[in-house]
Amino acid sequence: VSLLMAFMATVIGTTVGGALSFFASRNLARHYATYFVTRRMLEIARTVPDIVWALIFIYPFGVGPLAGILALIIHTTGAQGKLFAEVNENIDHKAIEGIRASGGNWYEEIRFAVLPQVMPNFISYTFWRLALNVQAATVMGFVGAGGIGHELITAVKLLYFLDAGAILLMIICTVFMIDMSSEKLRHWIIGKETLVGS
């Protein structure tokens, strides 16, 4: 359940955050009001800890994985949106000027000038976020928001220390494997980007 929570939160949060990042980038937003409002929304979503979001969602939705998934989605959206916006603000503007000179609209600028430059970083940060969300999904169980953390806290309360130790070991191994895999994928993507750039 924890892995599924982390995966869903990463996919949905990264997709929404990625889309909002273009409106939260000072160099891409067409209107300052759009930039300001979107940026503040992302900052609020990112600044409030995911565990606090989980406690907020437990009130209307009750104890269970739904509250945990929603909490992770909100926090991931804010974190990824803010991070992606900073990536967007460091792009080379020559490609945008070329699209604009040929009569392209804002969406065509994003599609053909911005995305090719930022996509490698977007993918790299997405894998990094997945590893973070696996750890966060584990903690969600401590407040009744689903995940393997709930099984761990139950085992500790019932004094099933052998079971608790096994669960803890499984959590550590899972996080370690995902972290190592995502790190290798990030290095592979960055290395590929370097080769293409050269």
What are these regions (language model features)?
Residues 1, 36-46, 86-101, 112, ...:
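Short amphipathic alpha-helical coupling elements at transmembrane boundaries
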Residues 1-24:
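Transmembrane alpha-helix signature in integral membrane proteins
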Residues 5, 141, 150, 154-179:
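Pore-lining and gate-forming transmembrane alpha-helices of multi-pass membrane transport proteins
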Residues 18-23, 83-90, 94, 133, ...:
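Membrane-spanning helices that line or support transport/gating and their immediate boundary helices
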Residues 24-38:
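Short loop segments and helix-boundary regions at transmembrane helix junctions
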Residues 42-73:
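Generic hydrophobic transmembrane alpha-helix motif, especially the helices
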Residues 63-114, 120-129, 180:
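Membrane-cytosol interface at the C-terminal ends of specific transmembrane alpha-helices
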Residues 124, 165-198:
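C-terminal transmembrane helix and the adjacent membrane-cytosol boundary/short C-terminal tail
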